[in-house]
From Swiss-Prot:
Reported function: Specifically methylates the pseudouridine at position 1915 (m3Psi1915) in 23S rRNA.
EC number: 2.1.1.177
Subcellular location: Cytoplasm
CDD domains: RlmH-like (cd18081)
Species of the source: Christiangramia forsetii (strain DSM 17595 / CGMCC 1.15422 / KT0803)
Keywords from the UniProt entry: Cytoplasm, Methyltransferase, rRNA processing, S-adenosyl-L-methionine, Transferase
Protein name (record): Ribosomal RNA large subunit methyltransferase H
Record carries keyword Methyltransferase: yes
Family: Belongs to the RNA methyltransferase RlmH family.
Record-listed S-adenosyl-L-methionine binding positions: 73, 105, 124-129
Signal peptide: none
Taxonomic lineage: Bacteria, Pseudomonadati, Bacteroidota, Flavobacteriia, Flavobacteriales
Reactions listed under catalytic activity: pseudouridine(1915) in 23S rRNA + S-adenosyl-L-methionine = N(3)-methylpseudouridine(1915) in 23S rRNA + S-adenosyl-L-homocysteine + H(+)
Subunit structure as annotated in this protein's UniProt entry: Homodimer.
GO molecular function: rRNA (pseudouridine-N3-)-methyltransferase activity
The gene coding this protein: rlmH
């Protein structure tokens, strides 16, 4: 199985990018992990929020196949502990999926089309984080999930 994280816009801070790369590289030990960055939209001054979400949604969905399991990182999604998130990942792997895709939306969230296509929604916290930080937090939690599944000492219960 491949796990893919799809994000809108590049990471602004090189320090964050370096930390994300550390966890992305570590994940390769457990599973094929891909990080896809959809470039920020150009000329958005004349677009309202819904138009921007719609255009971003088209770009997100253009890379999604019918057989993919799509999970949105959304403030209204289900919350997990690190242990229960590892169980969630294991359940997805047990289904024989080829690709599990996690998506971090743009500044205004997701379009209705993306919500309709999504198979699941998860939330990292009730708190609000920058989309840049969510990339790091999610990648670290995904790495943590695999160390939990493998009973490795990274996670302390």
């Amino acid at each position: 199985m491949t796990i893919k994280l799809v994000c809108i816009g590049k990471t602004d801070k090189k320090e964050l990018e370096a930390l994300i790369k550390i966890y992305s590289d570590r994940l390769q030990h457990y599973i094929k992990f891909e990080f896809e960055i959809i470039p920020d939209l150009k000329k958005t001054k004349n677009l309202d929020e819904n138009q921007q979400k719609s255009k971003e949604g088209e770009l997100i969905l253009s890379g999604v196949q019918n057989s993919d399991f799509v999970v949105l990182l959304d403030e209204n999604g289900k919350q997990f502990s690190s242990e229960s998130f590892s169980e969630y990942i294991q359940k997805r792997m047990n289904t024989g999926l080829k690709r599990l895709i996690f998506v971090i939306g743009g500044p205004y969230g997701f379009s209705e089309e993306v919500y309709k296509r999504a198979d699941s929604k998860i939330s990292l916290s009730k708190m609000t984080f920058s989309h840049q930080m969510v990339r790091l937090f999610f990648t670290e939690q995904l790495y943590r999930a695999f160390t939990i599944l493998k009973n490795e000492p990274y996670h302390h219960r």
